[in-house]
């Protein structure tokens, strides 16, 4: 029995995780070359792929603007903040974005593929599942990170 190939397609949804997705996440995590990464499911390749990256100077508002109003996405965001002890910290948030206006098929597809992706992206500190912009307000991140 072989345990290699953890990025093989998920048995339920049939979606794997593209190598580029893992590499881009590592660039965000270790090299700080991205502020955020937005992922989408490419049904033709049966993989979760990178849709967009944000450079380190982009704001949280830029990140939110990159999430579609009517379709599901996954995303990771590198959140920098200062603690009450005045220490600079960084936490990585994983977002499962599933707006209420997205289609049922997309919601099911993204829901069944989420665990596979989050297993592949080692080093995520917090996960947020959101269906509308109020659930991804910057204050939500501040509360979770502190």
Swiss-Prot record:
Record key words, sorted: Actin-binding, Cytoplasm, Cytoskeleton, Phosphoprotein
Compartments, record wording: Cytoplasm, Cytoskeleton
Induction comment: By the root-knot nematode Meloidogyne incognita.
Positions of post-translational Phosphoserine modification: 13
Modification note: Phosphorylated.
PROSITE patterns, per the entry: ADF_H
Protein's UniProt keywords contain Metal-binding: no
Record domain ADF-H: where: 14-146
Pfam families linked to this entry: Cofilin_ADF
Gene Ontology terms describing biological process: actin filament depolymerization
Official protein name in the record: Actin-depolymerizing factor 6
Organism: Arabidopsis thaliana
Gene from which the chain derives: ADF6
């Amino acid at each position: 029995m072989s345990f290699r190939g953890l990025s093989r397609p998920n048995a339920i949804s049939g979606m794997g995780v593209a190598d580029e997705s893992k590499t881009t996440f590592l660039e965000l995590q270790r090299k700080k070359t991205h502020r955020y990464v937005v992922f989408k499911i490419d049904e033709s390749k049966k993989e979760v792929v990178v849709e967009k990256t944000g450079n380190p100077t982009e704001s949280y508002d830029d990140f939110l603007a990159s999430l579609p109003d009517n379709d599901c996405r996954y995303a990771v965001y590198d959140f920098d903040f200062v603690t009450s002890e005045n220490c600079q910290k960084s936490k990585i948030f994983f977002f499962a974005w599933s707006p209420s206006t997205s289609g049922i098929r997309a919601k099911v597809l993204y829901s069944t593929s989420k665990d596979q992706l989050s297993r592949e992206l080692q080093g995520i500190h917090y996960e947020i599942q959101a269906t509308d912009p109020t659930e991804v307000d910057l204050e939500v991140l501040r509360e979770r990170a502190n």
